[in-house]
């Protein structure tokens, strides 16, 4: 398993090692060991808006996940906007760092097959798993 973190923004310090550690823990738990790669692009609102155009949207989002299949050499790409995360973190009572990792986990779950747009049941399951990882890997560890 290889996790590539590409930081294309200068708005916030990014801890690439911690991003890789969290990604590896989630992926190991969800899919086990494998000979695959995952790319995580850290960017700003302007850049993520360009990616969103492929989805027919002209506004930024906090995260986009492009899943290519778990049997592929590159299982997916995750794009995260630090600007969007910075704006929304206070709304959820999170620090920037907490919100960043919460959104990272969200993107990872999409890569391994979770979806919250198909049904309320799927959404409930995905957000429960996301919250579990967040409290296991981020929130509870800070105390």
UniProtKB/Swiss-Prot annotation:
One of its GO terms (biological process) is rRNA processing. Its cofactor is Zn(2+). The keyword Zinc applies. Its EC number is 3.1.-.-. It is an enzyme of class 3 (hydrolase). Its main location: cytoplasm. The keyword Zinc applies. Zn(2+) binds at residues 106, 110, 116. Binds 1 zinc ion. GO terms for cellular component: cytoplasm. Pfam families: YbeY. It is found in: Cytoplasm. Keywords: Cytoplasm, Endonuclease, Hydrolase, Metal-binding, Nuclease, Ribosome biogenesis, rRNA processing, Zinc. It comes from the Bacteria. GO terms for molecular function: metalloendopeptidase activity; RNA endonuclease activity; zinc ion binding. Single strand-specific metallo-endoribonuclease involved in late-stage 70S ribosome quality control and in maturation of the 3' terminus of the 16S rRNA. Belongs to the endoribonuclease YbeY family. This is Endoribonuclease YbeY. It comes from Petrotoga mobilis (strain DSM 10674 / SJ95).
